[in-house]
Curated annotation (Swiss-Prot):
Binding sites annotated in the UniProt record for substrate: S139
Subunit structure: Homotetramer.
Organism in which the protein naturally occurs: Staphylococcus epidermidis (strain ATCC 35984 / DSM 28319 / BCRC 17069 / CCUG 31568 / BM 3577 / RP62A)
Name of the protein: 3-oxoacyl-[acyl-carrier-protein] reductase FabG
Family, similarity comment: Belongs to the short-chain dehydrogenases/reductases (SDR) family.
Annotated Gene3D superfamilies: NAD(P)-binding Rossmann-like Domain (3.40.50.720)
């Protein structure tokens, strides 16, 4: 394989796992980060150990000019962007009545405008090659809602709508656009929960376990592959049955 992928927010967590899984599948991977250069470089070394090419690139996805330069650099180094994974995201939680306008704007800018920027800037290159796969990370809360996360939920619901619209616009050129919606995934946050709270959360999950980063990474890798070339405009829920 001589294909390349760009994963945003890939210096840790789910983004890191996605980048490593795509490398395992044979993709050259560009590791985008916002501020964690050392962590991003560590991921690059893990990827290179799998026998593919990789480099770290800093860009704030909320800024269109930075995204444009990022795409240009990835194409310069790899020759193309065959797969774009929009994973970068932030949270600034607060109750709706207490949420500051800046908290709303910051999350919207990164989580929703950032996805728009990356899709818009990568599309010309994918149109020229008449192929490509775009996978957007959304969330179970984009479908269910969640108290204290009005800004985050709005972005994740917006990503689902943006995914469907982009899929309709780009399908005729051989470009697929899908979303992956994680449920509760093991993280530092879930590890810090009390056993009682963990049990309460697990009661809502028919499969009776929290998800792993690899559950998400494997789903993204499938959607990026030729095995999923007849799938577009879909949101794949990976949540152990918590939302059906």
């Amino acid at each position: 394989m001589n294909k390349s992928a760009l994963v945003t927010g890939a210096s840790r967590g789910i983004g890191r796992s996605i980048a490593l899984q795509l490398a395992e599948e044979g993709y050259n991977v560009a590791v985008n980060y916002a501020g964690s250069k050392d962590k991003a470089e560590a991921v690059v070394e893990e990827i290179k150990a799998k026998g593919v090419e990789s480099f770290a690139i800093q860009a704030n996805v909320a800024k269109g000019d930075e995204v444009k330069e990022m795409i240009k650099e990835v194409v310069s180094q790899f020759g193309s962007v065959d797969v774009l994974v929009n994973n970068a995201g932030i949270t600034k939680d607060n109750l709706l009545m207490r949420m500051k306008e800046q908290e709303w704007d910051d999350v919207i800018d990164t989580n929703l405008k950032g996805v728009f920027n990356c899709i818009q800037k990568v599309t010309p290159q994918m149109l020229r090659q008449r192929s490509g796969a775009i996978i957007n990370l959304t969330s179970i809360v984009g479908a269910m809602g969640n108290p204290g996360q009005a800004n985050y939920v709005a972005t994740k619901a917006g990503v689902i709508g943006l995914t469907k619209t982009a899929a309709r616009e780009l399908a005729s050129r051989g470009i697929t656009v899908n979303a992956v919606a994680p449920g509760f995934i093991v993280s530092d946050m879930t590890n810090a929960l009390s056993d009682d709270l963990k049990d309460q959360m697990l009661e809502q999950i028919p499969l009776k376990r929290f998800g792993e980063d690899t559950d998400i990474a494997n789903t993204v890798a499938f959607l990026a592959s030729d095995k999923a070339k007849y799938i577009t405009g879909q949101t794949i829920h990976v949540n152990g049955g918590m939302y059906m």
